[in-house]
């Protein structure tokens, strides 16, 4: 490790997915170096320096130098790998093999399949697509609100998604929720429309490790 860190994390400064991996690493006190490849979000193929680690050509991808330079990509799989291997005290995760572990996994799958793609599609059509078809914008906006409704229904009955404590499942939602509610959705009041979910989100965002990483992102974006 020439940089002296245990992990190399390929990420994207404005995008959410690499940052919620960084959240997990920071929560567990694991050292890592962020690498930001020259990724054109409108391109169909990633740059060579990323494709050699992730054949999908997208971020995030993680190299674990403490485990024979093992490479893993897809944020849900990365987060699961990190907590399974390194969260031995179960600070932010549940023990493998337990029922709660599979509930945690359920929420990670929901984040990856139910939150990320729909939130990302709204960003694409709102910010990058040459046309702005209102029917498409409405579809993804409504789907985002549906996802928030799922979270609201569950969190109205319990403080955290699983295990009566904040876990990787809760944290994995944070970066997309923050980006979509502060910079993308129009005429949207998070606290008014989904008060329980908004409160839950703010508690996660205020955690010292999460705040540290998100502040780092803000500084990088400010630098251009």
Question: Residue locations for each model-derived region?
Answer:
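Active-site-flanking alpha-helical
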Residues: 83, 176-177, 214
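Positions that flank functional sites
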Residues: 39-41, 166, 219
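Residue-level recognition of oxygen-bearing side chains
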Residues: 77, 196, 209
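GST-like domain detector, emphasizing the conserved glutathione-binding G-site
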Residues: 2-135
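C-terminal helix/juxtamembrane-tail motif
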Residues: 210-224
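Phosphate-coordinating loops and pocket residues in cytosolic domains that bind phosphorylated ligands
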Residues: 52, 206, 215
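GST-like fold's C-terminal all-alpha helical module
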Residues: 107-202, 206
């Amino acid at each position: 490790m020439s940089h002296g860190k245990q992990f190399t994390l390929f990420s994207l400064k404005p995008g959410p997915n690499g940052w919620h991996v960084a959240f997990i690493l920071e929560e567990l006190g694991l050292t890592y170096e962020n690498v930001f490849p020259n990724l054109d979000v409108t391109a169909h193929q990633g740059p060579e320096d990323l494709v050699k680690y992730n054949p999908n050509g997208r971020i995030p991808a993680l190299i674990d130098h403490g485990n024979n330079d093992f490479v893993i990509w897809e944020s849900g799989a990365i987060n699961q790998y990190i907590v399974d291997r390194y969260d031995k005290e179960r600070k932010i995760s549940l023990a493998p093999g337990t029922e709660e572990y599979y509930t945690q996994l359920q929420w990670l799958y929901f984040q990856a399949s139910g939150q990320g793609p729909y939130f990302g599609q709204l960003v694409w059509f709102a910010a990058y697509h040459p046309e702005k078809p209102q029917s498409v914008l409405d579809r993804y906006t409504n789907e985002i609100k549906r996802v928030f409704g799922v979270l609201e229904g569950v969190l109205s009955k319990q403080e955290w998604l699983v295990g009566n404590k904040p876990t990787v499942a809760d944290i994995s939602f944070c970066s997309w929720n923050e980006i979509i509610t502060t910079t993308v959705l129009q005429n949207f009041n998070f606290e008014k429309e989904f008060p329980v979910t908004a409160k839950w989100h703010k508690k996660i965002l205020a955690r010292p490790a999460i705040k540290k990483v998100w502040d780092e992102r803000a500084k990088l974006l400010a630098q251009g």
